[in-house]
């Protein structure tokens, strides 16, 4: 009886030690598991947004979507939402396929999913919600062709915007041209005397013809003085026979002629220099454009890059079109 009583406490102690050992081993797995510590290979999908940040524990949070370069540049287009699917394990890390809607001129280049390791950058466990996408944005073939086309029309578009811009001197230039045109009109095209009187067999002498009448020379031999008007010894023009058809004669040009000639020359210079700096090669009202504009001016081709409402371009279709594009890449732990 004494031996049995002594053996029972030992068995109880052994049982308690085994139970304690089991709790120490299985406790963290059963009761103390951290829900934010997950195995990266168990993540099946990621939905990332351009206006959100990742969670963080050891490091600072990063944007869920981050452009890091590419042929198109990061300012060309920004996707709103990207979804990445776990495509499997390649022996090194998880591989991803990321899809989003992009403009038809752009596509994903190199992509990589970056996740924060839970304890270190080498930890196979990651912090839940710490993954983000880093991507390159490249041009498609259509985007490259649009880029080349926009380069052809660059000079024309720049000139139009300079003329229509409030900050440019286009309005001042136009105002100066109008003033010069008015001066030339007054000097050359405006006739203060009105239209000549109708034809008459015996027209009266006008003021201009009287000025020239006193200076007419002697008629040649064989001509009557009735057809030549009064004679004078000074050199000048006749107002008799000629005035019957012309109605009036004009005085010689004075200083107004030379000032008008100078203004006209200045106006022609300004028009010439303005046309030389633009792609216009024809007349002002009917410009002739380079061969690249032919067939494209009234076409509905895709508008050049950077085009917008009110911009003068070779395309009338400014509607943006999108398509679903995919990018493929691996994982980087940070």
UniProtKB/Swiss-Prot annotation:
<comment type="similarity">
    <text>Belongs to the SARAF family.</text>
</comment>
<keyword id="KW-0812">Transmembrane</keyword>
<dbReference type="GO" id="GO:0140268">
    <property type="term" value="C:endoplasmic reticulum-plasma membrane contact site"/>
</dbReference>
<dbReference type="GO" id="GO:0006816">
    <property type="term" value="P:calcium ion transport"/>
</dbReference>
<keyword id="KW-0406">Ion transport</keyword>
<feature type="region of interest" description="Disordered">
    <location>
        <begin position="308"/>
        <end position="334"/>
    </location>
</feature>
<feature type="compositionally biased region" description="Low complexity">
    <location>
        <begin position="313"/>
        <end position="326"/>
    </location>
</feature>
<protein>
    <recommendedName>
        <fullName>Store-operated calcium entry-associated regulatory factor</fullName>
    </recommendedName>
</protein>
<feature type="topological domain" description="Lumenal">
    <location>
        <begin position="32"/>
        <end position="168"/>
    </location>
</feature>
<keyword id="KW-0106">Calcium</keyword>
<feature type="signal peptide">
    <location>
        <begin position="1"/>
        <end position="31"/>
    </location>
</feature>
<keyword id="KW-0813">Transport</keyword>
<dbReference type="GO" id="GO:2001256">
    <property type="term" value="P:regulation of store-operated calcium entry"/>
</dbReference>
<comment type="function">
    <text>Negative regulator of store-operated Ca(2+) entry (SOCE) involved in protecting cells from Ca(2+) overfilling. In response to cytosolic Ca(2+) elevation after endoplasmic reticulum Ca(2+) refilling, promotes a slow inactivation of STIM (STIM1 or STIM2)-dependent SOCE activity: possibly act by facilitating the deoligomerization of STIM to efficiently turn off ORAI when the endoplasmic reticulum lumen is filled with the appropriate Ca(2+) levels, and thus preventing the overload of the cell with excessive Ca(2+) ions.</text>
</comment>
<comment type="subunit">
    <text>Interacts with STIM1; the interaction is inhibited by the interaction of STIM1 with EFHB.</text>
</comment>
<dbReference type="InterPro" id="IPR009567">
    <property type="entry name" value="SARAF"/>
</dbReference>
<feature type="transmembrane region" description="Helical">
    <location>
        <begin position="169"/>
        <end position="189"/>
    </location>
</feature>
<keyword id="KW-0732">Signal</keyword>
<dbReference type="Pfam" id="PF06682">
    <property type="entry name" value="SARAF"/>
</dbReference>
<feature type="topological domain" description="Cytoplasmic">
    <location>
        <begin position="190"/>
        <end position="334"/>
    </location>
</feature>
<keyword id="KW-1133">Transmembrane helix</keyword>
<keyword id="KW-0109">Calcium transport</keyword>
<keyword id="KW-0472">Membrane</keyword>
<keyword id="KW-0256">Endoplasmic reticulum</keyword>
<dbReference type="GO" id="GO:0005789">
    <property type="term" value="C:endoplasmic reticulum membrane"/>
</dbReference>
